[in-house]
Amino acid sequence: MIVCTTENIAGYRIDKTFGEVFGLTTRSRNLVRTFGAGLKTLVGGEVVTWTQLQDQARLEAIERLKNNADKIGANAVTMMRFDSNEANGIMSVVAYGTAVKVSEL
């Protein structure tokens, strides 16, 4: 499965457009780690726990995007983007794009 952030894929032509496809994940933060991260904000610097959580969520959202595209017969996703939201310690990440069928030129 090819996933790209561009409208076209070099060396491929788009044979069919299926439309929008997405992958979503929602995760909660570990209470103990959140407390430690809160202390980290007092002294400054990267909050590694939150960075890792967001990285894992983005990877999971991409995998779900690929699975959803595959289910409808696509072999690529173009114009892939991310959106995220966090409220009350719960983070949602969505990866979305256009599911397409491509073939090599």
Swiss-Prot record:
Pfam families: YbjQ_1 (PF01906). PANTHER family: UPF0145 PROTEIN SCO3412, UPF0145 PROTEIN YBJQ. This is UPF0145 protein OEOE_0637. Belongs to the UPF0145 family. It comes from the Bacteria. HAMAP family: UPF0145.
